[in-house]
């Protein structure tokens, strides 16, 4: 059986976050190792769901849990950047540091999550835009992943899909003659709404169409296939997500 569902960008972010909490590697890292969630719009949802999964009722405003932001011209931020990244150390949550001060103490078995700005679905590749002249948070993240085998997970929404391999786009963006932000390929495990649907329901989804208006800008249509029971689970999940308000920062 196949059903078609629509997800707004905010619904997709919430879905990704919930899917990650159902992932055995993520759960293992949170409870028995270290999980570092680097600030970003999607990772704000991940941090919320992580607190909920741990039964941690502390106040957390995901609006300020961010780094660089792509926003419409003239848009006003509602909250100041919080200035921290969230570390979950053997089930205990810390908000007293950032990736630069925390990641050097992480090693094999630990996990770091870093969002992305570009997604090439055919090869499961992601890239992140770089505004800082020293490379920003991505440099210590990749160093930990490659140098110490810290697992790197890249939560990224389907609205960020691109039409060429990430290395090719990075070559264009990083050329000496280019202007604007640079791009860095991310070597970790890419995690999208498609992965979340599979994790939460067992159904398989493919991207069918995209785009909308009146709050559905950037939305995606997915064709989801599975058993009757799985599709019932998908419909129930989408109904639950449908009340998700638009993302605020």
Predicted regions and their residues:
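N-terminal low-complexity or amphipathic/hydrophobic leaders
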Residues: 28-64
């Amino acid at each position: 059986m196949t059903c078609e569902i629509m997800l707004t960008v905010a619904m997709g972010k919430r879905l990704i976050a919930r899917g990650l909490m159902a992932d055995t590697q993520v759960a293992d890292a949170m409870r028995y190792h270290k999980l570092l969630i680097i600030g970003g719009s999607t990772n704000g949802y991940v941090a919320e769901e992580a607190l909920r999964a741990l039964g941690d009722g502390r106040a957390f405003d995901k609006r300020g849990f961010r780094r660089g932001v792509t926003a419409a011209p003239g848009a006003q931020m509602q909250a100041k950047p919080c200035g921290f990244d969230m570390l979950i150390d053997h089930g205990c949550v810390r908000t007293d540091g950032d990736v630069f001060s925390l990641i050097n103490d992480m090693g094999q078995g630990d996990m770091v999550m870093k969002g992305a700005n570009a997604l090439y679905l055919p090869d499961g590749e992601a890239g992140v835009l770089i505004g800082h002249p020293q490379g920003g948070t991505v440099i210590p993240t990749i160093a930990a992943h490659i140098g110490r085998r810290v697992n790197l997970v890249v939560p990224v929404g389907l609205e960020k899909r691109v039409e060429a391999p990430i290395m090719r786009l990075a070559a264009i963006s990083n050329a000496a003659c280019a202007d604007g932000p640079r791009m860095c390929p991310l070597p970790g495990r890419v995690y999208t709404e498609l992965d979340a649907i599979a994790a939460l329901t067992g159904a398989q989804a493919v991207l069918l169409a995209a785009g909308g208006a009146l709050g559905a800008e950037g939305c995606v249509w997915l064709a989801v296939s599975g058993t009757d029971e799985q599709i019932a689970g998908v419909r129930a999940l989408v109904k639950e997500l449908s009340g998700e308000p638009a993302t605020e920062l």
